[in-house]
Amino acid sequence: MMENTRIRVGAEAFSVGDEYTWLSQCDEDGAVVTFTGKVRNHNLGASVSALTLEHYPGMTEKALTEIIADARSRWSLQRVSVIHRVGPLFPGDEIVFVGVTSAHRSMAFEAAEFIMDYLKTRAPFWKREATVEGERWVESRDSDHIAAKRW
């Protein structure tokens, strides 16, 4: 299934259009679901001027591979693409892309949401925000852990 899986972690920007084109090439699938996360210009009541993402190389990709394998064991999926940027990012920049294909929309929607929920709670990424008050590390939210528990 690795030929039907794309995992990329890096500083480079990605093209949502290119990912959609790759995902949609499976003629047997009736559903393509994608999610793109962006840097907000605010968080926890403060203006955000930049966000720096760090990760543990090798371990991060391993965690993403395991999350995708878990999704594949729950839903019948064809292609899966997960991209996560690291390094300095700014409001409006795209951070994360999750795309999945399946025969039916319900499986594709659920699998994409599952992957995103688990990515937020199980993949080793660390965020540092720059605000007017200075820099601060962003802790994981309780809502992310609650969302992941439903699976």
Swiss-Prot record:
Pfam families reported for this sequence: MoaE
Sorted UniProt keywords: Molybdenum cofactor biosynthesis, Transferase
SUPFAM superfamilies cross-referenced by the UniProt entry: Molybdopterin synthase subunit MoaE
EC number(s) on file: 2.8.1.12
Catalysed reaction equations from the record: 2 [molybdopterin-synthase sulfur-carrier protein]-C-terminal-Gly-aminoethanethioate + cyclic pyranopterin phosphate + H2O = molybdopterin + 2 [molybdopterin-synthase sulfur-carrier protein]-C-terminal Gly-Gly + 2 H(+)
Top-level taxon of the source organism: Bacteria
Keyword field contains Transferase: yes
Involved pathway(s): Cofactor biosynthesis; molybdopterin biosynthesis
InterPro entries per the UniProt record, alphabetical: MoaE_sf, Mopterin_biosynth_MoaE
UniProt GO MF annotations: molybdopterin synthase activity
Any GO BP annotation: Mo-molybdopterin cofactor biosynthetic process
Record-listed substrate binding positions: 38-40, 104-105, 120, 127-129
One GO cellular component term: cytosol
Function as written in the Swiss-Prot or TrEMBL entry: Converts molybdopterin precursor Z into molybdopterin. This requires the incorporation of two sulfur atoms into precursor Z to generate a dithiolene group. The sulfur is provided by MoaD.
PANTHER family: MOLYBDOPTERIN SYNTHASE RELATED (PTHR23404)
Subunit details: Heterotetramer of 2 MoaD subunits and 2 MoaE subunits. Also stable as homodimer. The enzyme changes between these two forms during catalysis.
Family: Belongs to the MoaE family.
The protein's name in its UniProt record: Molybdopterin synthase catalytic subunit
Organism, scientific name: Yersinia pestis
Source species taxonomy: Bacteria, Pseudomonadati, Pseudomonadota, Gammaproteobacteria, Enterobacterales
